[in-house]
């Protein structure tokens, strides 16, 4: 599997996990109802499936690396969905996390 395909899988996983969590948040905190919560739970389940498509056989490695994608993706989601404006420290932290993801997943072994 190419690095590009692996990165694409991480991006899809992030959409499902962050989107799912956001839908649950909207259903509970913003009182949008059970449909939103149910859609969020379904999206979170899809995230779990997408993670299994990564080429590495080690669950811990995949989830640890995905953590970096989750951090950066959450900031991007907040910008797009909620008008959040990250500061330079948010951006710096996200870049550090993405660097960590790249080392964990793609360093030669």
Swiss-Prot record:
Name of the featured protein: UPF0060 membrane protein RHA1_ro06609
Cell compartments where the protein resides: Cell membrane
Membrane topology (UniProt): Multi-pass membrane protein
Membrane-spanning segments: 7-27, 33-53, 62-82, 88-108
SUPFAM superfamilies, per the entry: Multidrug resistance efflux transporter EmrE
Classification of source organism: Bacteria, Bacillati, Actinomycetota, Actinomycetes, Mycobacteriales
Pfam families listed in its UniProt record: UPF0060
Gene Ontology CC, one term: plasma membrane
